[in-house]
Amino acid sequence: MSKETTSYTNAKLGPLPTKAATIPDNILDAFSLKGKVASVTGSSGGIGWAVAEGYAQAGADVAIWYNSHPADDKAEYLTKTYGVKSKAYKCNVTDFQDVEKVVKQIESDFGTIDIFVANAGVAWTEGPEIDVKGVDKWNKVVDVDLNSVYYCAHVVGPIFRKKGKGSFIFTASMSASIVNVPQLQAAYNAAKAGVKHLSKSLSVEWAPFARVNSVSPGYIATHLSEFADPDVKSKWLQLTPLGREAKPRELVGAYLYLASDAASYTTGADLAVDGGYTVI
């Protein structure tokens, strides 16, 4: 009598194998987010706002998260322009209880969450970590860039498991895979490496009920890169095969793919959108 074997180490979290998605005959329809609810942290500007607007254009209702820059006007813009439901929520993502409260409020206001993008982040601008006194600067970067995205996943995961499906997308960074020069940013690199591997780890844990992926942007023209002087940016561009920074909207395609049914068999992936930086 042969012994029954299985490759599933996480079957206790839900039934496996998962049910295949029904993909529309027209592949363009697979990229539609109509009827879905998307929640995007750090979406009052930069990459987060570009993603939030892209999701609204694709038909999703969108919950916008902000902290220091109110975004009620942007939620109103999405509703008026694209005919979707949108609302802005203030949240300190480094406070687990605040994250928990906001997620519960979004679930109450929208009825559910289908797509969650953990995008909030800050840059390291202090230079060599060995010259920085104390650990406060380190803790700030790790709290925002790593701990906060775990808080979001920890609260949203049960919603996905209850639904039996969902898409969770982390904003990692090419810095998760390489060491940037000429700027020195050990804290940021380490935090983003943690995000990338957290994404891969949860893709296994959540396989019975959700897909989990990450996007790793390269140099993007947002406020996070404003700390760099022209000489530093010149070096960046010399090391980037496409020779320029990206506009935030150039990342939206990656986030839309991962959120949509077009990516129904994509989990545990990290999509580098870096102008070719990490291949040289």
UniProtKB/Swiss-Prot annotation:
Record key words, sorted: NADP, Oxidoreductase
Entry keyword annotation includes Oxidoreductase: yes
Residues the record lists as binding NADP(+): I47, K74, N119, Y188, K192, I220, T222
Residues making up the signal peptide according to the UniProt record: none
Active-site residue numbers: S173, Y188, K192
A single MF term (Gene Ontology): oxidoreductase activity, acting on the CH-OH group of donors, NAD or NADP as acceptor
SUPFAM superfamilies per the UniProt record, alphabetical: NAD(P)-binding Rossmann-fold domains
EC id: 1.1.-.-
Pfam families: adh_short_C2
Family classification: Belongs to the short-chain dehydrogenases/reductases (SDR) family.
Function of the molecule: Unknown. The enzyme has no activity toward sorbose.
Name the UniProt record assigns to this protein: Sorbose reductase homolog SOU2
Gene symbol of the encoding locus: SOU2
